[in-house]
Curated annotation (Swiss-Prot):
It comes from Synechococcus sp. (strain CC9311). One of its GO terms (biological process) is L-histidine biosynthetic process. This is 1-(5-phosphoribosyl)-5-[(5-phosphoribosylamino)methylideneamino] imidazole-4-carboxamide isomerase. Gene3D superfamilies: Aldolase class I. Belongs to the HisA/HisF family. It is an enzyme of class 5 (isomerase). Pfam families: His_biosynth (PF00977). Its main location: cytoplasm. It is found in: Cytoplasm. It catalyses: 1-(5-phospho-beta-D-ribosyl)-5-[(5-phospho-beta-D-ribosylamino)methylideneamino]imidazole-4-carboxamide = 5-[(5-phospho-1-deoxy-D-ribulos-1-ylimino)methylamino]-1-(5-phospho-beta-D-ribosyl)imidazole-4-carboxamide. The active site is at 8 (proton acceptor), 129 (proton donor). Its EC number is 5.3.1.16.
Length: 256
């Protein structure tokens, strides 16, 4: 299972939102490239970028930072947030990104997902962000009537590389991933699933190993890394060794 550090970009800075709320912002760094290089130094094999400005408004405010990171890093970089057209997706891929993540457009224009997946094999990922089992769009500001698992089942047949499953209720809370929702997503999907949201300690990461046989092949970690609750290098080693344990019996689940 791959541990993927996240850098969320808002007006050029590295931030985290609490449960997707743009009014609850924690800023961690004003130098996204330096932060990205730090994760590489600690052993990251892939980097996950989120353009929060793009997700909310569709404006490419963070493109300078994105292009610099894609150019300078020696590992694959993927980006989501505001990718809602064929032109935008191809522009990002041409600047050196390994993958682009489609969110809102996957509901509003599923034909575009299929076209991009056909034109760019292994480069297109769908991000399914869910609140109470239903997909949220446009930077989590709007909610749809589409069930997350139904969307996963449908789009996983479109030739995409993977699905990123984000549980909004746990994102940025450090309260632990929603294992039940992830299990349902993995069972519905025909492509690998990457978990996102809620990881607060090493035990949370290890608990995800139980879902690996179902197709959960990666996990995106944000706030727990920035808060120092998870050491990236140690986590990568632990996952590689497959140290599966019962998270309920692990003292490290306490986040207070």
């Amino acid at each position: 299972m791959e541990i993927i550090p996240a850098i969320d970009l808002l007006q050029g800075s590295c931030v985290r939102l609490h449960q997707g709320d743009y009014d609850q912002v924690t800023r961690f760094s004003d130098d996204p490239l330096a932060q990205a290089q730090q994760w590489v130094k600690q052993g990251a094999t892939r980097l996950h970028l989120v353009d929060l400005d793009g997700a909310r408004s569709g404006q490419p405010i963070n493109d300078q930072a994105v292009r610099l990171i894609a150019k300078e890093l020696s590992i694959p970089v993927q980006l989501g947030g505001g990718v809602r057209s064929l032109e935008r997706a191809e522009e990002l891929l041409s600047c050196g990104l390994d993958r682009v993540i489609l969110g809102t457009v996957a509901i509003e224009n599923p034909e575009l997902v299929m076209e991009l997946a056909s034109r760019h094999p292994h480069k297109i990922v769908v991000g399914i962000d869910a609140r109470n089992g239903f997909v949220a769009t446009r930077g989590w500001v709007e909610e749809s009537e589409v069930e997350a698992t139904a969307l996963a089942q449908r789009l996983s047949k479109a030739g995409i590389a993977a699905i990123i499953s984000t549980d909004i209720a746990t994102d940025g809370t450090l309260a632990g991933p929603n294992l039940e929702a992830l299990r349902a997503m993995a069972q519905a999907s025909e492509v690998p699933v990457i978990a996102s949201g809620g990881v607060g300690c090493m035990a949370d990461l290890l608990s995800l190993l139980a879902l690996e046989p179902l197709g959960v092949e990666g996990v995106i970690v944000g706030r727990a890394l920035y808060d120092g609750r998870v050491d990236l290098h140690e986590a990568i080693q632990a996952i590689a060794e497959g140290r599966l344990q019962d998270p309920l019996s692990d003292q490290s689940r306490t986040i207070a």
